[in-house]
């Protein structure tokens, strides 16, 4: 299966994430706490917690911080109880946006999210207005040059759903959300190291933006991601910023 080029967008996204690394620990602690509260403290039986722990390890979070977050989630330590919220809306050129939050104050969060949309040329929509365009899935990206046939065989054997070759030569392995960590581990054991990967909400129909529109859309995404209560921002926009 062929796909269009995502390599430049992936590299740009990683650069933005690195620039915001100071907020990553806070978001990971929230996610670990909620995952442990919802599914228990055993990552072997809790795919959401397993994914959060993978991200914590990738970002070199101290083990004491991780364990404390798990203990707060399971009730072994007292902690804040976070509410999960999802907001939907539209950005530049009608591009769809989904914003996932963890908060202890719903009133504050919706006001902050609405302000970020309004100030940056977007519109906060109603529940379900864009969700139909997104699918929940995991992905792993491998650099151009990896043998596609061998990677495909290893990935499908590990439980992947699909393998996509992009126009730029990078290869993307698609998984079910709960299978992502297992497929990643199996491929690493087989010698395949991904350069990017996550469990995400992926748009089925994308909106290409370039020039000023792309810059404005990036500003809107950044404003949302900068909010303390926001965990993840998903969009149908493909930004051509060069």
UniProtKB/Swiss-Prot annotation:
User: A single Gene Ontology molecular function, please?
Assistant: DNA binding
Per the record's keyword annotation, is Cytoplasm included, yes or no? yes
GO terms in the biological process aspect are: regulation of DNA-templated transcription
Pfam families registered for this protein in UniProt: TACO1_YebC_N, Transcrip_reg
Tell me the keywords, alphabetical order. Cytoplasm, DNA-binding, Transcription, Transcription regulation
Specify the domain of life of the species encoding this protein. Answer: Bacteria
Family label: Belongs to the TACO1 family.
Give the protein's recorded name.
Probable transcriptional regulatory protein NGO_1291
Species of origin: Neisseria gonorrhoeae (strain ATCC 700825 / FA 1090)
